[in-house]
Amino acid sequence: MQNPFVPQLVYIEPRALEYPLGQELQDKFENMGIEIRETTSHNQVRNIPGKNHLQQYRNAKSTLVIGVRKTLKFDSSKPSAEYAIPFATGCMGHCHYCYLQTTMGSKPYIRTYVNVEEILDQADKYMKERAPEFTRFEASCTSDIVGIDHLTHTLKRAIEHFGQSDLGKLRFVTKFHHVDHLLDAKHNGKTRFRFSINADYVIKNFEPGTSPLDKRIEAAVKVAKAGYPLGFIVAPIYIHEGWEEGYRHLFEKLDAALPQDVRHDITFELIQHRFTKPAKRVIEKNYPKTKLELDEEKRRYKWGRYGIGKYIYQKDEEHALREALESYIDTFFPNAKIEYFT
């Protein structure tokens, strides 16, 4: 995806128009000539066009729903943060392996919430509860928030809010390069801006509808030069023919692009490919021609939260992946911090 996301269809909850952002977005999309429909609830969007499941799925991915977030209880977001902060749900990307395939289920449309101040007030309450500890908030658990922020500027508002806080830190990750409007945000070093990166094979075969790797790396350089703490998530680390060379090439590219003066505070998060049985069913339905390897027989089973287990690589494969990636990071980014491998 080279151009910033523009929805083909917009739904608005009437209550959203009681908030300035809701009104602003309605005006914006009217001026752009985009069809706007009313929906009673952002959870009950019906009549998305399409003759069959695949058409409806693809159309849903280019549909934006403007709503009010009613649930202000934040979920946990370990290991990346204490809490997930819910500014948006859903994503315009088509990553075959994404866990949102199952958590979003029958609602793959993108939702943005306009009661931003209420969400930030709730974050402040969580910070007070945990004082004097720092509290980290993850803004990309259920969406790629950067992908829609050129339209909403919600993320920019949040970055500046956390920039003024004493005990709050914001984090998010993106596969999009449309970051220019965020470069002048007053972040005060309180927001870690992370990019999802991967071997060429994975991006080419499993990440349609996202920015190319070179564009992500270019954006990462801009972000680092704007003074943001920078991070990279390598996920999913995926075994494929020539994977050792593929991942080495990724780190060589990153090393060639990142200036030395922005390397003093870089983090890496490493996540091996995993899938659940329900995810496999949904992935094969939504992307019937995918090359993604989803063979339970080749994997080992690991129990997860809520009793839903996942299939991950065998111990020897996991060890090889971890050893290879950690050695590349050690070679090219010896001062970086590896936050976790999972």
Curated annotation (Swiss-Prot):
Residue ranges forming the DNA-binding region read: 218-235
**Which InterPro entries does the entry link to?**
rSAM, SPL, SPL_Bacilli, SPL_firmicutes
| EC nos | 4.1.99.14
The domain of life for this entry's organism is Bacteria
Keywords of this entry: 4Fe-4S, DNA damage, DNA repair, DNA-binding, Iron, Iron-sulfur, Lyase, Metal-binding, S-adenosyl-L-methionine, Sporulation
User: What range(s) does the Radical SAM core domain occupy?
Assistant: 77-305
Could you identify this protein by its name? Spore photoproduct lyase
* Species this protein is from: Bacillus subtilis (strain 168)
